[in-house]
Amino acid sequence: MARRARPSTRPATRTRQDFTMKTVTFKNRMWDVAADLRFPKDFDETKTYPAIVCAHPISSCKEQTSGRIYGEQLAEQGFITLAFDASTQGASGGEPRFSEDPALRVEDFRCAVDYLVTLPFVDEKRIGVLGVCGGGGYAVNAAMTERRFKAVATVVGANYGRIMREGDLTPDSALKALDAIASQRTAEARGAEPLLTTYIPTSKAALEQAGLTNVDIVEAVDYYTTPRGQQPGSPNQLRFSSLAPAVGWDAFHLAEHLLTQPLHIVIGGGEPGAFGSYRDGFDLYNRARSSEKTLQIVPGATHYDLYDQPAPTGQALEQLVPFFRKHLGV
């Protein structure tokens, strides 16, 4: 049976020295989107604060890098942050489960802003967005048509549509993928069980058996399948028949026309990997219409270093915090 969203009950509250967190929900269409709302130290509900929506990578959840690293540390710097689970994933509702549909993912951002503007302590004129990996691509795409976002940042932002089209890097990879998806949809329409595949190998042993050595794949397995980053809301499952829209989608389409907000792009200067966030960072920088845009290269950092490693994420935040302070204020 498909897993449903957690019931929208009184939020649980967790307090740390420098921020407070509440688990909340907001609506996307007919289902609940689960989110963690973080408040800065000495939060005063009679005042108004800038807010930042934090989006997780493909296959991830709010308890990983988007919330536990960037959401927490931005809250400690005086911002309200909202890290959410994508629709159909993690603790959020929506069907079919484990879908990766760009239109649905982008709509989550608009619904997140709809939620924030109902909170009396959020200044609706000072809302920004930050996305990590595929969440960065979705954040950029959302910001093009969601003018309530006043500042945009990506950390190793990746264009998921490009990744899907490139596939195994053979000329007909995208067409072969679409043919396979079409066949699977036909089978499911006739009663077959949904095909749940995986994003990455399920263990280091499976990685070695497959003979995969690309730095992004190796470090993804280390992050997602070990205590380093493993979370129940990130089960490494993907509904294969949901992928056709992603193959025909481009996260940066029309950025040269519609992406005008101040933009800060963070990429790693270490070994480039298969997910392509290094080149996507340059592509986005060159295409964005934003008159204020910066490209930060963290020396020696790989894609996954910028998920959770203290030194690289610290260097990213050294520029992200003043960027958001300049454009949103604290």
Feature-to-residue mapping (PLM):
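N-terminal cap/lid segment of alpha/beta-hydrolase-fold proteins
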Residues: 18-47
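The serine-hydrolase catalytic nucleophile loop
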Residues: 59-72, 86
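Conserved alpha/beta-hydrolase
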Residues: 73-91
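Alpha/beta-hydrolase active-site loop
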Residues: 99-120
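Alpha/beta-hydrolase-fold enzymes
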Residues: 140-223
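Short beta-strand/loop motif that positions the catalytic acidic residue
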Residues: 265-267
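Conserved alpha/beta-hydrolase "acid-adjacent" motif
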Residues: 272-281
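Catalytic histidine-centered segment of alpha/beta-hydrolase-like enzymes
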Residues: 301-313
